[in-house]
């Protein structure tokens, strides 16, 4: 069963010239987000740009969130990654979805109108409540810190 998520079209080209975000296969975890711009964009090496997707969503359910993740081919082949690494969309956010693209490569990269830029994935959320303690129960891991457990 699929969970309904409210989606607002902010650009009339969505649903006509460009499809609504959708799962490509029954096993897909993410839906592609597209660059819905008025002109092509050229991202220079080292530059970060914020690109509209033409949609807004309202997750509404506090036990869910949406995350925006990079498309693997753009990062690996062209050095195009998300400027914020991962975009977190809280359940109560209702504004436009934007994709921050960073060119970490050495060549300018052109984004055409409608290019697929990133993936939108919905994930479960557990809201925690802190319990103050003076000491933790000891664990095998302890307080070794970053990299303490090694690679083997």
Swiss-Prot record:
It comes from the Bacteria. Pathway: Pyrimidine metabolism; dUMP biosynthesis; dUMP from dCTP (dUTP route): step 2/2. It holds the Pfam family dUTPase. One of its GO terms (biological process) is dUMP biosynthetic process. Substrate binds at residues 71-73, 84, 88-90, 98. Keywords: Hydrolase, Magnesium, Metal-binding, Nucleotide metabolism. Its cofactor is Mg(2+). It catalyses: dUTP + H2O = dUMP + diphosphate + H(+). InterPro entries: dUTPase, dUTPase-like, dUTPase-like_sf, dUTPase_trimeric. The keyword Magnesium applies. One of its GO terms (molecular function) is magnesium ion binding. The keyword Transit peptide does not apply. Its EC number is 3.6.1.23. Belongs to the dUTPase family. This enzyme is involved in nucleotide metabolism: it produces dUMP, the immediate precursor of thymidine nucleotides and it decreases the intracellular concentration of dUTP so that uracil cannot be incorporated into DNA. This is Deoxyuridine 5'-triphosphate nucleotidohydrolase. It comes from Shewanella halifaxensis (strain HAW-EB4).
